[in-house]
Amino acid sequence: VYAELLQGNANLNLLALLVNERAALFKEKINFKLPGGQGFSAHQDAPAFTSFGQRFHVTMMLSIDQGTTDNGCLEIARTSRLDNSLDMNEDLTLSDNAVAGLRWMPVETAPGDLVLFDSYVPHRSAANFSDVSRRVLYATYNRATDGDFRTQYFTEKRRVFPPDVERREGVQYDAGVFNVGNPVAFE
């Protein structure tokens, strides 16, 4: 079911309309935001996603649970179409000046709702102030002519930012491009 959802013809045909050619799955993840979980700082995905030589991506967000302002739903900036990166901090989050110059809109969703946005859309989310978890599936696609880098992406991510169970004591892991805006503290 998962493969058909992310890489089936129905989904790829929809994404082809947005990237103007066949799309290739670049990466996917599920974000779990537990009650009290922190939000994600304002950022654009493009600076992180270009590390494999690609320039443009479209992300599909599928709500597993209801997304509300109380549980930290996605917020996007209301802006004209961007095709460049805004002013950023060293950690690739948007600078205070960039954030202050944007008008933010919460994207409240019901389970099963899809939200599609490209890699230049500024976005963020607030903390989960509710007493229920909020889960969201994110799948990011690039133009097929830019190449299939999914395996390389996850190999490199595991090398520089391994799961907790694979980390060695005393080693400092820097999330870098693999967790832009992520509120998780790294030890």
Regions found by a protein language model. Name each.
Residues 40-48, 62, 92-100:
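Active-site glycine-rich loop that binds ribose-phosphate moieties when present
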Residues 34, 64-66, 141-143:
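Non-catalytic surface loops within mature trypsin-like serine protease
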Residues 1-42, 48-51:
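Non-heme Fe(II)-dependent double-stranded beta-helix
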Residues 121-122, 126-187:
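Non-heme Fe(II)/2-oxoglutarate
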Residues 28-30, 60-62, 137-141:
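A structural signal for short, well-ordered beta-strand segments
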Residues 67-126, 146:
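Double-stranded beta-helix
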Residues 45-57, 102-103, 109-110, 132-133:
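A short beta-loop-beta micro-motif enriched in histidine and acidic residues
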Residues 21, 47-54, 63-73, 81:
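Active-site region of the double-stranded beta-helix
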